[in-house]
Amino acid sequence: MEFSTQQTPFLSFNREQWAELRKSVPLKLTEQDLKPLLGFNEDLSLDEVSTIYLPLTRLINYYIDENLHRQTVLHRFLGRNNAKTPYIISIAGSVAVGKSTSARILQSLLSHWPTERKVDLITTDGFLYPLNKLKQDNLLQKKGFPVSYDTPKLIRFLADVKSGKSNVTAPIYSHLTYDIIPDKFDVVDKPDILILEGLNVLQTGNNKTDQTFVSDFVDFSIYVDAEEKLLKEWYIKRFLKFRESAFNDPNSYFKHYASLSKEEAIATASKIWDEINGLNLNQNILPTRERANLILKKGHNHQVELIKLRK
């Protein structure tokens, strides 16, 4: 098999080249298993899972085995058998690119691996500041930007998980109310693998050498990519679907959008993209792409067309 060997830190594969790397890994997901894993606006097929995610699962398992071997060597050197360290995978990318779907599919595939590893999934949405604080600090228009997250709290969470603590809690975010759910938590209890999904999980500081970042705790990082034109198109399409469903819920923070005409809804979604999501993409998210260990570049119909793997 041939792949790109240009002077770049990445190896590049098209779909066919990448699919060959699946080897004999069986697909244990069925169409019925796949449906609950899909995002609101995605129609991802089992073929996509076989072509893209099975080879990726195989690769990640090799990395995890190597990581466990390294831990064994360290324990032998130190003369003590410390608690097993969870392997942390981060998934970054823009709003509407399909990060959550990728995360759920990976969680399912890695959980069904013959080694029966325990795989937990947490999104960084739970570490957004509460809505009242964002309003108070005049940050509502910056929601999703790095400044809108309680990063120290997220760092403490990751440090506790990485150190092998039991029953580490993470806040839960509601997309319906657009806010943190009071007194509700996800519990992470010594997983073999933790998948962390969020917009800004690849970020580092600007020459701040004494600061700890989310990326410091990550063993393998994935960036889900697509051209901005497609991202905006997918965002508007998703907005229109929400207008006909979730926005009609009386508890929805966005219920005022339910009465918009289709033309008004498209204009509103386009404005939100240009002023918030697109801005965040170009200022904060896209600049972190090249730090990833793996880049999945999507084309039309949410299909991955190009895979870039760090050498």
Swiss-Prot record:
GO terms (BP aspect): coenzyme A biosynthetic process
EC number: 2.7.1.33
GO cellular component, as recorded: cytoplasm
Subcellular location: Cytoplasm
Keyword terms, alphabetized: ATP-binding, Coenzyme A biosynthesis, Cytoplasm, Kinase, Nucleotide-binding, Transferase
Primary subcellular site in the record, as a coarse category: cytoplasm
Binding site for ATP: 93-100
GO molecular function: ATP binding; pantothenate kinase activity
Protein's pathway: Cofactor biosynthesis; coenzyme A biosynthesis; CoA from (R)-pantothenate: step 1/5
Enzyme class: transferase
Pfam families listed in its UniProt record: PRK (PF00485)
Coiled-coil regions listed in the entry: none
Catalytic activity: (R)-pantothenate + ATP = (R)-4'-phosphopantothenate + ADP + H(+)
Entry keyword Nucleotide-binding: yes
Family matches, as CDD domains: PanK (cd02025)
Family from the record: Belongs to the prokaryotic pantothenate kinase family.
Name by which UniProt lists this protein: Pantothenate kinase
Native source species: Haemophilus influenzae (strain ATCC 51907 / DSM 11121 / KW20 / Rd)
